[in-house]
Amino acid sequence: EGYREFYNVVRLAESKAHSTPIFHGELAAFRRSLLNEVGGFPTSIGADDSHTATMIALRGYRSIAVDNAWCVESVPRGGYHKWRVRRAQHLIQHFATTLRHLTKASSGLRGVLLVETHLHLFNPWILAVATTILLYLAITGSLTALTLLVLGTTLLVYRPYRTWITTQLYLVIATIRNLWTREIAWGKQAKAR
């Protein structure tokens, strides 16, 4: 619930700013003429719904999450973490591919794309590097570093913070996995509501 609640708030905010570059395929509608204009769904990246919506938005249209639509998504019964890592892999592929199109984006869309690109490609590594530096400093006697690490660990009881940290871990793992497998196709998972 924590991730999905956060996800929905961000997608709606991006939609109000201009367009959202991230979709979950359980409920997405595309105008056929626009699908044809962008060449349909890409087969080279896993987040085909998100990438197609972004390519449409780059042509001056909008890709939005609707605040009054209701959709129930089934989640995997087993392999939930693998599912989250795969989804993270696909979004990393999407934003890495979208980087070269940033100059074509309108200012509203460019802002959204820059923030999401930073959050998916760079932010997880900033956290990993900062944590590594703090660990080193704490081991070598820095009371400030130790205090920050204890504070960060204690904050894990706060659900939004825990959700953010977990998401950063999925993104780091996904980036590493993308080095040897892009996992464009995968087996169907049994899902529960």
Residue ranges and their predicted role:
Residues 77-147, 183-193:
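Basic/Trp-rich segment in TM-proximal cytosolic loops or flexible interdomain/linker regions
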Residues 75, 157-159, 181:
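Short helix-capping/hinge motifs at transmembrane helix termini and TM-loop junctions
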Residues 113, 117, 146-151, 160-163, ...:
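Short amphipathic alpha-helical segments
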Residues 2-7, 42-112, 166-177:
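Catalytic donor/gating beta->alpha subdomain of glycosyltransferases that bind UDP-sugars
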Residues 15, 153-155, 170, 174:
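N-terminal membrane-anchoring/stem segments of glycan-assembly enzymes
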Residues 17-21, 176-193:
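Low-complexity, charge- and small-residue-enriched intrinsically disordered regions
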Residues 1-39, 43:
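Long helical/loop segments within the catalytic core of UDP-sugar-dependent glycosyltransferases
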Residues 91, 125, 151-163:
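Transmembrane alpha-helical segments that form the membrane-embedded catalytic/substrate-channel core
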